[in-house]
Amino acid sequence: MAKKVIKLVKLQIPAGKANPAPPVGPALGQAGVNIMGFCKEFNARTQDQAGMIIPVEITVFEDRSFTFITKTPPAAVLLKKAAGIESGSGEPNKNKVASVKRDQVKEIAETKMPDLNAADVDAAMRMVEGTARSMGITIED
C-alpha cells in the first residue's frame, strides 16, 4: 500500500544553497522532516544551476520520509537574467526598465515548457511575454 501523505511544502530556494536556516528549517521542521537530509539532497541535485532560484515541492509522508520535485526557475527570474536587471519596474505601464529579444523569450519558453500548461512553444512564449510586460520589460523582434 502507498504511504499516506501528511503535508505538501512548496518553497523557492536558491540552487545549491539550501540550509537549515529560515525559510527551509521552520517549514520542514513543522513537518518533522530530516532537514539536513533534504538540504544535502537538494544542493546535490541543483548544484549545476547555481545562481537560479529553484521552486521545489516537498511531499512529506506519515513515517516522516519525504520526496521532492524540483521545477524550472520562475519566468521572472529567467527574464531578469536575460535582461541583465536586478528587479522589474515599479510602474510597468509607465517605466520600461529593459528589453529582451524575441529569440531570448523563445529560449525561456522552451526552458519553462515542462512546467507550463501550454500546448506548444508559441503559447508558452505568449505566457513569458505577459510576464515580461508586467515587469516593465519590452520585447524586441
UniProtKB/Swiss-Prot annotation:
GO terms for biological process: translation. The keyword Chloroplast does not apply. The keyword rRNA-binding applies. Coiled coil: none annotated. InterPro entries: Ribosomal_uL11 (IPR000911), Ribosomal_uL11_bac-typ (IPR006519), Ribosomal_uL11_C (IPR020783), Ribosomal_uL11_C_sf (IPR036769), Ribosomal_uL11_CS (IPR020785), Ribosomal_uL11_N (IPR020784), Ribosomal_uL11_N_sf (IPR036796). PROSITE patterns: RIBOSOMAL_L11 (PS00359). It comes from the Bacteria. Keywords: Methylation, Ribonucleoprotein, Ribosomal protein, RNA-binding, rRNA-binding. GO terms for molecular function: large ribosomal subunit rRNA binding; structural constituent of ribosome. One or more lysine residues are methylated. Pfam families: Ribosomal_L11 (PF00298), Ribosomal_L11_N (PF03946). GO terms for cellular component: cytosolic large ribosomal subunit. Part of the ribosomal stalk of the 50S ribosomal subunit. Interacts with L10 and the large rRNA to form the base of the stalk. L10 forms an elongated spine to which L12 dimers bind in a sequential fashion forming a multimeric L10(L12)X complex. Forms part of the ribosomal stalk which helps the ribosome interact with GTP-bound translation factors. Belongs to the universal ribosomal protein uL11 family. This is Large ribosomal subunit protein uL11. The lineage of its organism: Bacteria, Bacillati, Bacillota, Bacilli, Bacillales. The gene is rplK.
